[in-house]
Regions:
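Low-complexity, Pro/Ser/Thr- and charge-rich linker/hinge segments at domain boundaries
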Residues: 1-29
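Mature extracytoplasmic or organellar-lumen-exposed domains after removal of signal/transit peptides
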Residues: 22-164
């Protein structure tokens, strides 16, 4: 194989491919996290509609619903950033998805070595996402437990509800 003009003779194409694969894997994982948040948001929308029609609903159920809504908003902010500030072109800290997306956008159409900044962005995003995944799993477990509790309290069916 003959290198193209402009390619360095000591170019490590395998290292470039490995970095792009690492970026791709992280992008896929963050997309899955975003999909989980979207599904949780829809489940909470149905739960909100079901709460007033639940036969044995208590104030604690409403408080738990509010807690879950706030936690979902926090998780969305951590993964995707603040959409309000972004719409107003305000300066915001980069979110996990913006760091991964920025690297993917800036590096996937090239055969050049990733920059140190790109490497640092992926390392930072991967580290933050590992911590985030644990929090997301905990939230999803809490949501499932809450749905089960509502089912026992006589709530109408909502998406994601499991058979007991």
């Amino acid at each position: 194989v003959k290198p193209l003009p402009g390619d360095s003779p000591d170019m490590d194409f395998q290292a470039v491919a490995n970095f792009q694969q690492q970026t791709s894997n992280l992008l896929r994982e963050t997309s899955l996290g975003r999909k989980n948040l979207d599904e949780a948001e829809e489940r909470l929308r149905y739960i909100e509609a079901a709460l007033p029609r639940t036969t044995r609903v208590t104030q604690a159920h409403f408080q738990e619903f509010e807690r879950l809504e706030k936690e979902l908003a926090t998780l969305k902010m951590r993964l995707m950033g603040d959409p309000i500030l972004q719409q107003k072109n305000e300066s915001v800290s980069p979110s996990i998805t913006s760091r991964v997306g920025g690297v993917a956008y800036g590096h996937w159409d090239t055969r050049q070595q990733p920059t140190e900044t790109q490497k640092a962005q992926i390392e930072s995003a991967a580290r933050d996402y590992q911590a985030y995944k644990g929090d997301l799993k905990s939230f999803m477990d809490d949501l499932e437990a809450f749905q089960s509790e509502l089912q026992k309290a006589g709530a109408p069916w909502t998406p994601g509800q499991k058979l007991d």
